[in-house]
């Protein structure tokens, strides 16, 4: 509001500020505002502040943007404080139910989301019907920019989290009398898999 935006907060802690443009088509600038212990002072919040500053500068210069700007501050991206994660993201996408207000709790205090926010209804900030795009400024959480001597870069790929599970079954036997060629120990096999994974990843440039 201090930046001249029409602001609101929903039941899931999502904060949105809107600056009308020449078109109802909306460009979203945002990030998450929660962080983790030792996450650094710029984790997430820098992207929200950058969006606010862009909108504020446009107002100060008397410029009406071509598109409506929505500055979005997303809650619980880290999934640390509460028992469920991505509350804001799920809320704006319409993928969370009202029962979450009582189901989701603070991991330390045990308070429900309803108690934490003091809200009675599960109102959520929705994505605009006409969305031009989503822009997020974020500090790099790796060494690449520093290594290459750059101060800024555009992200072309986002890492996807994929969990794989292997069950390696061995055969129990007497360790002092079973020759190595007759053993079926699972740990050496696991070691081979662990050793092969980095080489597999290195086949793809810039893989992490």
Where are these regions (language model features)?
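Midchain, well-structured core segments that form catalytic/ion-binding scaffolds
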Residues: 76-77, 81-208
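Acidic/His- and Gly-rich active-site-bordering loop/insert found
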Residues: 1-40, 58
């Amino acid at each position: 509001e201090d930046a001249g935006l029409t602001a609101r907060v929903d039941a899931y802690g999502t904060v949105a500020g809107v600056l009308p443009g020449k078109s109802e088509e909306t460009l979203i600038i945002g990030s998450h505002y929660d962080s983790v212990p030792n996450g650094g002072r710029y984790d997430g919040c820098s992207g929200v502040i950058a969006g606010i500053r862009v909108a504020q500068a446009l107002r100060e210069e008397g410029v009406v943007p071509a598109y409506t700007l929505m500055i979005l501050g997303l809650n619980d991206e880290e999934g640390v404080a509460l028992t469920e994660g991505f509350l804001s993201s799920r809320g704006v996408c319409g993928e969370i139910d009202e029962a979450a207000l009582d189901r989701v709790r603070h991991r330390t205090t045990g308070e429900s989301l309803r108690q934490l926010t003091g809200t009675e209804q599960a109102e959520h900030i929705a994505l605009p019907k006409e969305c031009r795009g989503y822009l997020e400024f974020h500090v790099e959480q790796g060494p690449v920019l520093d290594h290459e001597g750059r101060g800024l870069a555009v992200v072309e790929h986002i890492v996807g989290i994929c969990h794989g599970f292997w069950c390696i079954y061995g055969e129990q036997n007497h360790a002092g009398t079973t020759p190595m060629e007759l053993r079926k120990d699972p740990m050496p096999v696991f070691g081979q898999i662990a050793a092969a994974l980095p080489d597999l990843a290195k086949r793809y440039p810039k893989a992490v």
